[in-house]
C-alpha cells in the first residue's frame, strides 16, 4: 500500500518449504530430484560491505515498511576514496571532520555530511520525506526505534520505553555541541537530515530523547553541532 507504506499478507496455496535450491543453470527451485545439478550456496546476512583504504566495515540492514536502512550508524574515518577525514576535538564554523566520543561513537560535521564523499554507493542521508515515511509507518512511536540504555534527563523524570521492535537500533549516542558530548550521551539521539531538495542540510534534524515516546526534530545548528549519520537506501 503506497499510501500508508505498509504491506498486506495474503495466504499462499503452496506447502511450507524449508529449503531453496539454486541449480547449475541459475534456476531457483523449491524442490530437487537426484538428477538435478545443485550448486552449493553460502547464505550470508544482508549487509553493506564498506571498503575504504583496506579497512572493511560491514553494516547490517533492516527493512521497515517499504524502506531499507542501515541498522547501525556510519563509522568511517576515511572518505570513500581512502583519503583521511580530519579528526576533531570540537565543532567550529565551516570545519570539516569527524569526532569520536569516549565510547567510540562517530559524529560528523555538516560539511562532511554534505561532501558527497562519505557515504557508500547507493546510500543516502535521509531527508524529512524519508523520516516522515518511517514516522507514519510506526505511528510516531519513538520506542519502536530506540535501543540500548536510555537515562533520564533529570532525576525526577521517567524514562520512556526502548523496545526496538522495528530493528532500527537507535542507540542514544548523543551529539557534539562545540566540545561537549558526554552530557548528551544516553539521553539524546539526533541524525543529520537533508532538506527535500537533497542539496543542503535542513534547519531541523531528526531527534529523540529519553523522556518522551515521540519522534521529534531539533535545531541543526550546523556551525556548532556534529551529529551521527544513519543511511537509507534509495
Which residues are covered by each model-predicted region?
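Conserved positions within compact, well-structured domain cores
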Residues: 19, 23, 29-234
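Surface-exposed interfaces of beta-sheet-rich extracellular modules
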Residues: 1-20, 192
Amino acid at each position: 500500500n503506497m499510501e500508508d507504506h505498509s504491506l498486506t499478507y495474503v495466504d499462499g496455496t503452496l506447502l511450507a518449504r524449508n529449503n531453496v535450491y539454486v541449480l547449475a543453470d541459475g534456476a531457483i527451485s523449491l524442490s530437487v530430484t537426484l538428477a538435478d545439478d545443485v550448486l552449493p550456496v553460502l547464505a550470508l546476512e544482508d549487509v553493506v560491505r564498506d571498503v575504504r583504504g583496506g579497512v572493511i566495515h560491514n553494516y547490517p540492514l533492516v527493512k521497515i515498511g517499504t524502506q531499507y536502512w542501515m541498522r547501525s550508524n556510519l563509522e568511517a574515518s576515511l572518505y570513500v576514496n581512502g583519503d583521511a577525514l580530519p579528526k576533531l576535538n570540537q565543532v567550529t564554523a565551516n570545519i570539516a571532520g569527524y569526532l569520536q566520543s569516549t565510547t567510540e561513537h562517530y559524529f560528523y560535521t555538516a560539511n562532511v555530511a554534505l561532501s558527497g564523499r562519505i557515504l557508500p554507493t547507493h546510500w543516502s542521508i535521509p531527508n524529512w520525506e524519508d523520516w516522515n515515511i518511517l514516522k507514519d509507518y510506526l505511528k510516531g512511536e519513538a520506542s519502536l526505534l530506540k535501543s540500548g540504555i536510555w537515562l533520564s534527563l533529570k532525576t525526577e523524570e521517567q524514562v520512556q520505553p526502548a523496545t526496538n521492535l522495528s530493528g532500527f537500533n537507535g542507540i542514544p549516542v548523543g551529539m557534539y555541541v562545540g566540545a561537549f558530548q558526554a552530557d548528551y550521551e544516553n539521553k539524546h539521539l539526533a541524525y543529520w537530515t537533508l532538506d527535500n531538495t537533497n542539496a543542503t542540510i535542513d534547519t531541523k534534524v531528526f531527534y529523540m530523547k529519553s523522556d518522551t515516546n515521540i519522534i521529534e526534530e531539533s535545531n541543526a545548528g550546523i556551525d556548532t553541532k556534529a551529529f551521527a549519520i544513519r543511511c537509507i537506501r534509495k
